[in-house]
Amino acid sequence: MTYTVIFSTAAEADLFAIYDYIAERAGAGIALRFVESIEVYCLGFANMPERGLRRDDLRPGLRTVGFRRRATILFEVDQTARRVVIHGVYYAGRSLEGLEESD
């Protein structure tokens, strides 16, 4: 059975910021391909949501998974609603510190 994958407003903002960052340094085409590849990877959680590392130390139910050694995807699996919520995409070593205090 598949899950619905939802990108939070914060995750969408992260993807736009990643696009802008890469586009300034490497061009719009490369930025677009990278961001689209993150989105496709996240949509894959629909079939296999229980991957990554549980990070209950940051927030109960939170999971993280690396993407191409350049980004960390933060997400939560809601078994009851059969959905995966992507909470954020941290690029190039952005710190997870203080996450437990944010929404």
What are these regions (language model features)?
Residues M1-V35:
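Arg/Lys-rich, positively charged N-terminal/basic patches that mediate binding to nucleic acids
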Residues G27, L43, N47-R51, R70, ...:
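Generic structural signal for secondary-structure transition and capping sites
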Residues A31, L53-R55, G98:
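Short, hydrophobic secondary-structure boundary micro-motifs
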Residues M48-R83:
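Basic/aromatic recognition patch in beta-strand/loop cores that engages polyanionic ligands
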Residues R69-T72, E76-D103:
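Enriched for short, Lys/Arg-rich terminal
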